[in-house]
Each structure stands twice: as structure tokens, then as C-alpha cells.
Amino acid sequence: MTDFWSGYIIVLALANIVVVAWLLMWTRKMDLSEMAEDGTTGHEYDGIKEYNNPLPRWWLICFWGSIAFALGYLALYPGLGKFQGALGWTSHGELQKDEAAYDKQYGPLYASFAAKPIPELAKDERAMKVAGRIFANNCAVCHGSNARGGSGYPNLTDNDWLYGGEPEKLVETLTNGRNGVMPAWLDSMGEQGVREVVAYALSLSGRKVDADLAEAGKARFGVCAGCHGANGKGNQALGAPNLTDTTWLYGGTQKKVLETVFYGRKNRMPNFAKTLGPERVHLMAAYVYSLSHK
């Protein structure tokens, strides 16, 4: 924050408090010379007259108390531009304090989990209970509370993996995240070309399709083979899905597959290296591993 904006915020905040205090003093009682003979202010509407009674004392005390609280808060805590407050408190510092206390209490537990190989850890009932809570807080929002995923979010309970389901691959995915891209083919292939390729792609998994369309699509499939392979079985190094099974990330209906090839797809799996740290990443990899090895 620049000095100008810091000063601007300080002046604006304090000026607001001063104006409110002045307004309270100015309106607390009307000048007696302006009062009508009947003790009213002279204001009347629809038969209702306004009397010049003093503000309730409890209300005044609360109002002045709120002003005092505001000034005290701004003196002790951040709120006036660059001024950090007399206590030097920051939310970042509070977070670090809480994290340090958490690591002190649970660090040895996670260290004991990290010492075990993932296949062995996946069978540790206590470890999986802890991991289940971490999953609920960090992963369930996308993959679902039952880990079965949804449209665009992989099912973690089966044995179909875009980037590989080996322990080291799961750690890699959780640590670095993934960025999946499927290019759009409508402009380069045209609508008819896309329909032909989709017919062929669906035939690879045993679906009933128009034979002529599928045959024409087979000739065009060469541009897809660069990622999905000549046999359509995919490539885990690229995250290219297997087209010969019945697992479809965005839906396997003809309409959904056409939509995918027409317009492409972009998907992102966030990384958890900083959020969880290596020990909890190891634990979560074991949890995900356990879901498909029951």
C-alpha cells in the first residue's frame, strides 16, 4: 500500500468517527428558542407531533461506547492504513501460531504414517480414519463424499486411472496437480468429420453405431491416435483416456461425446503440496489407493 492510500484510509476512517460524534452532540437536544409553546419542535405530520425529548441515556451510553470501542480497536489492531496496531497482531501470524500448535500435537502421528509404504498404510484402520477426515475437508467437494466423482471429476473407487493408479503416481498427482486438455475438433474436422470419429470411438467400446460412419471415422482417427494411441487405449503419460472401456469422465452418451470432441475439454486438479505437506500427501495417496483395493 502506498503512503497516499494509507493516509487516505486513515483520514477517512477517523473523519467518519469524528462526524458521527459531532452529529450525536448536535442532535442530542434542540435549542429551546426553537421550541413551540406546547413543548414540541413544531414539526407535525398527519396529526403526529414531534416532541423535543432528550435521547435515552442508555442509548447515548451505548453510542459513545461504540465510538470508544472503534478508537480502541484502531489503536490496537490493523485498520488505519499501514499502521499495524499497538499489539502487532496479524491474521497471518495467528495462522502460523495455530499451524505450529497443530504440527506439535499431530506431527509425530503423521511422521509414523509417512514411514509406512502406501500399500501397507492403506490397510491401517486408524490411518484411514484420519485420512477420511482429510478427504472430506479437501477432496469431497469435487470427488464426492463417497469418492465416486461426477461429470468432470474422476471416480476414485474403480481401477480406471488417467495418470496411473500406482502409489508413486498418486503421490505425484496430489503433489503437483494435473492439467488435462482435450482440443476442440469442430473447426478442423467439421461437423460431419467429428460425427464419424465419434462413431468410431464409440465402436471401440463395443457400442452399436452406424457402420459407415464408424468406417469413415477410422480413417480420420489418426489425428486422435497421437494422444489416445492407435488402438484407442489411451496414454497415462499424457492423461489421455482409454476409449475402449465404458468409463467416460464427462459422460458416454453420444451427445456428450460429440460435445467433447466438438468443443474440447479443460480440466484441472489442484496441487496439495503446500496445503497438506508431504506427510499428509503420503497419507492421502494411501487413502485413495485403498478405495480401489478393497
Question: What is each model feature region?
Answer:
Residues 46, 52, 155-158, 167, ...:
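Acidic side chains
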Residues 34-37, 117, 142, 156, ...:
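Residues at structural and domain junctions
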Residues 123-148, 158, 164, 171-176, ...:
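Sequence/structural segment immediately N-terminal to covalent heme-attachment motifs in c-type
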Residues 2-122, 163-169, 184-201, 276-288:
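Periplasmic c-type cytochrome electron-transfer domains
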Residues 150, 154-157, 175-194, 201-212, ...:
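Axial heme c-ligation environment in periplasmic c-type cytochrome domains
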